[in-house]
Amino acid sequence: MRVPAILLVVLALSACGGSKAASASDVVRAWSAALDRNDNEQAARLFADGAQIVQNGEATLATHADAVRWNAALPCGGRIIHLELQGKNQVLAIFELQERPQHSCDGPGSQAAAVFQVKNGRIVLWHQTPVPAQYAPGGQVI
């Protein structure tokens, strides 16, 4: 009787340490998918409290509610056309902008880029950046 009980405890403890935070690329994909569904609540869950936003100035998303509002204000969704890992926790994402539910995208078909820094499975920096020329052939770059 003692052996099965001890075995259960060992199995339970070994399962506790096995999880790891999602990769930066996985977090970016999840954020993009949530935004494309207009699921601002889910998109916001991927941001750490205190996340920095660099887009026409700088802002800090101090709370989850701030992150929900910021995501809800984005006019476009985007199809990821390229992800480039820039170190363990940073990803450059290139998007083709598209409409998203209940929004009016101001640049459908254009490309946009953002650098994401991710720590412990949460976005700590979202920085809009110019689209590298090699990813914008014939397209309008914003």
Residue ranges of predicted features:
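An amphipathic alpha-helix signature
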Residues: 25, 40-44, 64, 68
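Low-complexity, intrinsically disordered terminal/linker segments enriched in charged
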Residues: 122-142
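Sec-dependent signal peptide recognition
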Residues: 1-8
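Short, aromatic-enriched amphipathic alpha-helices that serve as compact interaction elements
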Residues: 21-38, 46
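Short, well-ordered alpha-helical segments enriched in acidic and aromatic residues
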Residues: 38-50, 54
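C-terminal motif of bacterial Sec signal peptides marking the signal peptidase cleavage site
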Residues: 12-15
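Bacterial signal peptide processing site
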Residues: 17-19
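Surface-exposed, charged secondary-structure patches
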Residues: 65-109, 115
